[in-house]
Amino acid sequence: MIKPRIIVTGATGKTGNVVVTELLKEGYLVRALVRREDGRSAHLKAHGAEIAVADMSDAERVADALKDVQRAYYCPPFDPYMIQGAVAFAVAAKEARLEHIVGMTQWLASPSHPSLMTRQHWLVDRLFSMTPGVAHTIVRPGIFADAYLATIGFAAHLGVFPWFGGNSRNAPPSNEDIARVAVAALTDPARHAGKSYRPTGPELLSGEDMAKAIGRAVGRSVRFVPTPTWLFMKSARMGGMPIDLLSNIRYYVDDHSLGAFELGAPTADVLDVTGRPPEDFETIARRYAALPPNRRTFGNWVREFAGLLLAPLVPGFNLDRYDRELRRPFPSDPQFAPDSKVWRREHGIADPPAKPAASAHEKAVSATGRGQWLESQ
């Protein structure tokens, strides 16, 4: 019996690549949708995937890519035009009579978040759930282990783990576990249609916990160092992160400090959906530590030390001006995820204990501060 053809968007990305590989192992026909052909797409083609090239906002090319496809893994491009791409995909999915979409979204997705990307994730989730005749499964991880391990080379060579999460914790999942949850949903729509899953690691970890795990992975003592947001943003820019992503990520630093990623974590979703326990952070860290750029060599040490010296000198982006020039919409009452009643209700998070009523003076101070914050946007 011929198995369904499944299209994977973002097929050369962190989860898409694994989704393609796992589906091919299980004998599915896989069409990998990529923005351009390169060595990564050639690798997927060599392993048996069909390659389709399309910009996600190009409605006609996306419609062509979905011909003769029955199921889809949808990982949206993280750019300001996410909604354009999602609408193009939903229209094509309806015309192609897709059976099932497994959509990658965010744990933070909510309608009044200050991040445009996060508000768009919330809308995309609803768009696919409303697409007639197409079943929908949501995969909504928090910050991946991959994000924390972006600095493992720094830790390996200089013994320092930069931390931007304040006193909060997270149970970060691996790219592989997130992808395996998506694959399980794609291969059994009857079981997973209409459901939402939050892949996590097996335990909540603080910055200090992660530093110790990384130290064991790289074979040296590593201490975590709280990093101010301005330095984190400069380092991210130096690492090649584009301004449109940084404009959103600055808010996730605040969400992290507010404890958004420890709420409701860890979950049993990876085990329940895939039948395998999630990878622990140290196991993931050992895999990253073994990569050539992170191995402890003199050349790598020079690169990391130079990065340490240069990061504070990198000019920062004016993110508020960028948002204004693009005329980005902004909610009238912006709320980080833990402060949003809608987010808490939709994610099964109990409301925090009621705070004592504020005095007139406290209300005045709060209103003044909020007004200044909004004006800065």
Regions found by a protein language model. Name each.
Residues 1-43, 57-60, 67, 78-87, ...:
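Oxidoreductase cofactor-interface core, primarily capturing Rossmann-like NAD(P)-dependent enzymes
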Residues 30, 47, 362-365:
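N-terminal cationic amphipathic segment used for targeting or macromolecule association
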Residues 54, 227:
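Cofactor-binding loops of NAD(P)H-dependent oxidoreductases
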